[in-house]
Amino acid sequence: MIHVVAIITAKPGMREAILKEFRANVPAVHAEAGCIEYGPAVDADGMGAIQTPFGADTFVVIEKWESPQHLAAHAAAPHMKAYGAKVKD
């Protein structure tokens, strides 16, 4: 199993717009062969010193894939290219 933790930092004030596009793409990713887990996570407020905050413009993507080949296919998927085009700016 392949684990991926991707840290995404949006331009200031754009995190929610990026997350909206991300969440719209999640069903297509979940339907991919080899996808075990794929989803966004944002900082929880008020966790105290135990948490190192990423900031208001950042979120984390947690991914699990059956194999490196499945992850490579995911990266090349048409819906990922379309997502990338929507959020590149």
Where in the sequence are the language-model features?
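Short, conserved charged micro-motifs
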Residues: 13-18
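Residues that line or immediately flank small-molecule/substrate-binding pockets and catalytic motifs
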Residues: 42
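Basic, Lys/Arg-enriched alpha-helical interface segments
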Residues: 21
